[in-house]
């Protein structure tokens, strides 16, 4: 099946982009594996006009927004993000009225419709820097409450998180899990995603996005790392650092990320059916806050 996918990909002129949380078999056939922003930026650099995207809907849409002239297809239309879907345009409008003048900073894990109402987009890697560089002591931030609280801690600014209980179910780790792994691996370094709850972040050695997690073993000579994010990241790290050991903090599985399989990836290439289509107006409006992020980050 892998050979068939690679053959069809070449014949039809597709590039395969896969998120870090995809199953190992899909990461291995991808031309590029990364976080949502790395993938969107990669798509902008490509001369190829056809992209098969392996991730969830908001990520595929981000690629389309930044590459409106390219054809973007996905293997499963139902692969979505429950956290992104919790935030609605109505909630954003309501908070804009409550806090006039406060910029709306939306995490990239948000719907395209919501992005059209944002002042700036951020990622888990640059959220702290983006908020720091905004000329405002108060920001409205969504949809991840934990990331918003982390940003508040690091910037000293007032961060109003929306919606009320926005969080990623996959990253709801237990602080006790860190105690347990420290007993089992006393020399290990613990790295957790900023979407984790505060008690977990406070007990970790490092807090970072998946892109940042990849850089830590380059600087830290530890032999064992405990990873607090979706299980797919373990494969990426083991591949990059074969001489180190990577242990999951907990068995954190994103069921939506795992909806993509070798079978439906092959089917996507055969039929080219699930194309990502967005209204022109949404693309134009959602692109502005994304470009603002690039501007702020220099």
Swiss-Prot record:
Iminosuccinate binds at residues 19, 36, 107-109, 124, 193-195, 210. InterPro entries: NadA (IPR003473), NadA_sf (IPR036094), Quinolinate_synth_type2 (IPR023066). Its EC number is 2.5.1.72. Pathway: Cofactor biosynthesis; NAD(+) biosynthesis; quinolinate from iminoaspartate: step 1/1. One of its GO terms (cellular component) is cytosol. Pfam families: NadA (PF02445). It catalyses: iminosuccinate + dihydroxyacetone phosphate = quinolinate + phosphate + 2 H2O + H(+). Keywords: 4Fe-4S, Cytoplasm, Iron, Iron-sulfur, Metal-binding, Pyridine nucleotide biosynthesis, Transferase. GO terms for biological process: 'de novo' NAD biosynthetic process from L-aspartate. Binds 1 [4Fe-4S] cluster per subunit. The keyword Ribonucleoprotein does not apply. [4Fe-4S] cluster binds at residues 81, 168, 254. It is an enzyme of class 2 (transferase). Catalyzes the condensation of iminoaspartate with dihydroxyacetone phosphate to form quinolinate. Belongs to the quinolinate synthase family. Type 2 subfamily. PANTHER family: QUINOLINATE SYNTHASE, CHLOROPLASTIC, QUINOLINATE SYNTHETASE A. This is Quinolinate synthase.
């Amino acid at each position: 099946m892998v050979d068939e996918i690679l053959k069809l990909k070449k014949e039809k002129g597709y590039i395969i982009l896969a998120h870090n949380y995809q199953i190992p078999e899909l990461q291995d056939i991808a031309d590029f594996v990364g976080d949502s922003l790395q993938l969107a930026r990669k798509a902008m650099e490509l001369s190829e006009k056809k992209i098969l995207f392996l991730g969830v809907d908001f990520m595929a849409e981000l690629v389309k927004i930044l590459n409106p002239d390219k054809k973007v297809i996905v293997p499963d239309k139902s692969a979505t993000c429950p956290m992104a879907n919790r935030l609605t345009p109505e909630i954003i409008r309501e908070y804009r009225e409550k806090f006039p003048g406060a910029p709306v900073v939306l995490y990239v894990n948000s719907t395209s419709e919501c992005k059209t109402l944002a002042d700036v987009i951020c990622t888990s890697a640059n959220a702290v820097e983006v908020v720091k560089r905004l000329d405002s002591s108060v920001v409205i931030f969504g949809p991840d409450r934990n990331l918003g609280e982390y940003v508040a801690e690091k910037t000293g600014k007032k961060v109003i998180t929306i919606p009320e209980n926005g969080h990623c179910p996959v990253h709801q780790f237990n602080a006790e899990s860190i105690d347990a792994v420290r007993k089992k691996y006393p020399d290990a370094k613990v790295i957790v995603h900023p979407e984790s709850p505060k008690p977990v972040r406070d007990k970790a050695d490092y807090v970072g996005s998946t892109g940042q997690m990849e850089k830590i073993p380059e600087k830290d000579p530890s032999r064992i790392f405990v990873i607090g994010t979706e299980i797919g990241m373990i494969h990426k790290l083991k591949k990059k650092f074969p001489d180190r050991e990577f242990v999951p903090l907990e068995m954190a599985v994103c069921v939506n990320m795992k909806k993509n399989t070798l079978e439906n990836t092959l089917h996507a290439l055969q039929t080219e059916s699930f194309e990502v289509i967005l209204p022109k107006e949404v693309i134009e409006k959602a692109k502005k806050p994304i470009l603002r992020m690039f501007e702020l980050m220099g």
